[in-house]
Amino acid sequence: MKIKVIILMWVLKVLLKIVKFCRMAEGKMKTPEVFYSSESKDAYIYFVLHEHKAHACFDKRDWTIFIDDSDLEKVGKKVRELTTDDSEYFDYLGHLAHEMEHAKQAHSLGGELFDKLYRKSSYYRAVFELEADAACMVAECKARIESKRMLKEHVHSVIDLRVAQANRWLAGYYTSLPIKEAARIYKRFAKKASLI
């Protein structure tokens, strides 16, 4: 009798563990939720860690961000609900595009390699940052053009300005890149977005 009770208790214990595991797995499979923090005018976007999604780590935080380009539009609509101020909206959108580009970089290279290159190679860090800034520029330009705050013809001038600003900024924190190489990065992103 005692043996039967012990076996029954053991089976129940195992079943409870299986149920607990299934619930945890189900929780992980849920669609990632979006969280916003708009303190000090910064728009940070957090997604719950989810399998097969890009994962990059910045400022000792885990950034888990969707890869699909359409997600920026979806997120942009949500951000638009949070602010009616146009300039603040453009800033938010640009910041989100910047971080999403870093996530794409991490996704294509693999998190570990991306992290290693970013931290140990000033050249790659500069390229990663310029690509992220180019994505930011594209998002801001598209939003400004759509809201009739900017003409498409002005994109070339914006690129020239961003290249000059980025190289001054990079020289102070990372390393400078040749102007031609920096310009190529911005133009590549603008062409891909059909802005030039």
Regions found by a protein language model. Give the residues of each.
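Post-HEXXH active-site segment of zinc metalloproteases
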Residues: 90, 106-134
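Active-site recognition of the HExxH zinc-binding catalytic motif
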Residues: 94-107
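Long, well-structured alpha-helical subdomains associated
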Residues: 125, 138-196
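Catalytic zinc-binding patch centered on the HExxH motif and its immediate surroundings
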Residues: 24-81, 89
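Short, solvent-exposed loop/turn segments at secondary-structure junctions
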Residues: 40-41, 71-74, 101, 110, ...
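Preference for well-ordered, secondary-structure-rich cores of eukaryotic proteins
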Residues: 67, 91-93, 158-163
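Short hydrophobic helices that act as membrane-entry/anchoring signals
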Residues: 1-23
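Compositionally biased, charge-rich terminal segments
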Residues: 1-6, 136, 143-145
